[in-house]
From Swiss-Prot:
Protein name: Helokinestatin-1
GO biological process per UniProt: blood vessel diameter maintenance
Any Gene Ontology CC annotation: extracellular region
Provenance organism: Heloderma suspectum suspectum (Reticulate Gila monster)
Coiled-coil positions: none
Subcellular location, principal: secreted
Tissue: Expressed by the venom gland.
Disulfide bonds: none
Length: 10
């Protein structure tokens, strides 16, 4: 699948 940016809590 297409690459994605994993959402990480700051």
């Amino acid at each position: 699948g297409p690459p994605y940016q994993p959402l990480v809590p700051r």
